[in-house]
Amino acid sequence: MTVKKVEIKVDINCGKCNSAIMEAVTEIEGVNHISLDEGNSILTVVGTMDPVCVATRLKKIKQKPVIISVGPPPKPPEPPKPPEPEKPKPPPAPEPPKHVCKPPYCNSCDVVSVTTYESGSGCTIL
């Protein structure tokens, strides 16, 4: 059998009626979930039970059930999808080196510096 949602209009006059309805319906085989809207006097039963069986059980406790609707149960809300992890960013381009490489050149073109020390005389005594 398939799971179905049954809505039944019942007479709720007091708290005793409320508990009698809940007890009668919970004894039915195949009932998964029961909710009772006291303001609108609507009993909602979800499960694989027969809706006529639910109405018959309510008649046995002196209720006048009216089946409002029979249909599939509401779909449970989908859990929110976890955020996708961000893709790793590609590494940044390497920075150019701080020193500048000179182009290669021939050894005959090397710059040579010559330093000379000239002092007035070769020997000094003080």
UniProtKB/Swiss-Prot annotation:
Boundaries of every HMA domain copy: 3-69
Induction remarks: Up-regulated by cadmium.
The record's section on InterPro entries has:
HIPP (IPR051863), HMA_dom (IPR006121), HMA_dom_sf (IPR036163)
Where is a lipid covalently linked (S-farnesyl cysteine)? 123
Q: PTM Cysteine methyl ester: at which residues?
A: 123
GO terms, molecular function: metal ion binding
Q: Which residues bind a metal cation?
A: 14, 17
The pro-peptide lies at: 124-126
Q: Which domain of life is it from?
A: Eukaryota
Q: Where is the composition biased (Pro residues)?
A: 71-80
Arranged from A to Z, the UniProt key words for this protein are: Lipoprotein, Metal-binding, Methylation, Prenylation
The record's function comment reads: Heavy-metal-binding protein.
Q: Which family does it belong to?
A: Belongs to the HIPP family.
The identity of this protein, by name, is Heavy metal-associated isoprenylated plant protein 43
Gene name per UniProt: HIPP43
